[in-house]
């Protein structure tokens, strides 16, 4: 499965690099974490690690560009006994491993920092928003006091709206992003589409290369 994912990311980079002289292609490796609030106001924390992605940006104007990409991420969440996993509905366990394939489409409003004096070391600060489609592959490895289990589920999230702040330090090097993600519909590990009202706030730091 991972070979397929990485092959797809590589193909995306190749296609994007040859598609348009006005476009930019990049790929990167990120780590970070997410704090989640569900519809009932309950909070949980998820660690990301790693997230590998590729993206293609097309300049629409001096201040706007359009990002299309794909990413694969692995995340794990320590989960205490006596509770139910918020996505799968499985009994409580210790560690839940989850794989995601994501296709984001973001519209970025770019603020160039080339002439900002003390901020000259930054490439740009950007605010972005757009829809995102997630394919979810869950591998739950956990146990409680009575039994152990390993379970896999497949699903997708048909609609997520994402907004965030990106700070790119020294072009083509390090990037820092802060995102707020509101999931409306959820079909991950479920047979039918559920109406969701979950908020996710993520911080990511990583390395990106490209042109």
Predicted regions and their residues:
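Predominantly the C-terminal beta-signal and adjacent terminal strand-loop region
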Residues: 69-80, 152-211
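Flexible, solvent-exposed loop segments that connect beta-strands
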Residues: 34-45, 74-99, 135-157, 186-199
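Gram-negative (and chloroplast) outer-membrane scaffold detector with strong preference
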Residues: 55-142, 201, 209-211
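Ser/Thr- (and often Asn-) enriched beta-sheet segments in non-cytosolic proteins
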Residues: 20, 24-26, 57, 65, ...
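Short glycine/proline- and aromatic-enriched beta-strand/turn motifs that initiate or cap beta-hairpins
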Residues: 19-58, 208-211
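Cleavable N-terminal export/targeting peptides
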Residues: 1-24, 210-211
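Transmembrane beta-strands of outer-membrane beta-barrel proteins
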Residues: 24-32, 69-71, 128-132, 177-181, ...
């Amino acid at each position: 499965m991972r070979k397929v994912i990485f092959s797809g990311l590589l193909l995306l980079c190749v296609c994007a690099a040859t598609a348009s002289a006005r476009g930019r292609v990049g790929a990167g490796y990120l780590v970070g974490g997410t704090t989640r609030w569900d519809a009932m106001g309950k909070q949980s924390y998820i660690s990301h690690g790693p997230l590998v992605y590729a993206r293609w940006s097309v300049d629409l104007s001096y201040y706007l560009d359009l990002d299309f990409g794909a990413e694969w991420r692995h995340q794990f969440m320590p989960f205490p006994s006596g509770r139910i996993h918020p996505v799968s509905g499985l009994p409580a366990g210790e560690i839940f491993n989850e794989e995601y394939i994501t296709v984001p489409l973001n519209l970025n409003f770019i603020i160039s920092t080339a002439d900002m004096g003390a901020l000259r070391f930054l490439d740009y600060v950007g605010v972005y928003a757009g829809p995102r489609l997630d394919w979810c592959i869950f591998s739950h490895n956990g146990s409680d006091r009575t039994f152990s289990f390993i379970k896999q589920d497949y699903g997708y999230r048909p609609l997520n709206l994402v907004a965030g702040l990106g700070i790119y330090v020294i072009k083509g090097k390090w990037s820092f992003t802060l995102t707020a993600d509101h999931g409306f519909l959820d079909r991950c590990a479920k047979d039918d589409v559920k109406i969701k009202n979950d908020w996710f706030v993520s911080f990511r730091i990583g390395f990106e290369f490209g042109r």
